[in-house]
Amino acid sequence: MREFKGYFIPKNKLPFWDKLIINGGMLLYQRYKIIGIEEKRIPINAINSVTLNKGIFFCTIIISSMGERIVAEGFTNKDGKEISTLLGFN
């Protein structure tokens, strides 16, 4: 399971989501609210990941079945663990 913390702006301009989790071909959106956690799941069509600069910088592009495109980019630490900032655009 791959997890990104950050934000995502979907095509229908819903409010920002706090966390995206990729699990079993599904993309899970989680938005934390005062009354609890709101979730939304959509299927994923493709995931393309590119790591540059000897594993320090990474960029992941996720294409959903709804045609939404998500770009997660950021840096890895010395152990190669992702430290990400999530950017979303159509």
Predicted segments, located by residue:
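Short, compositionally biased strand/turn segments
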Residues: 14-35
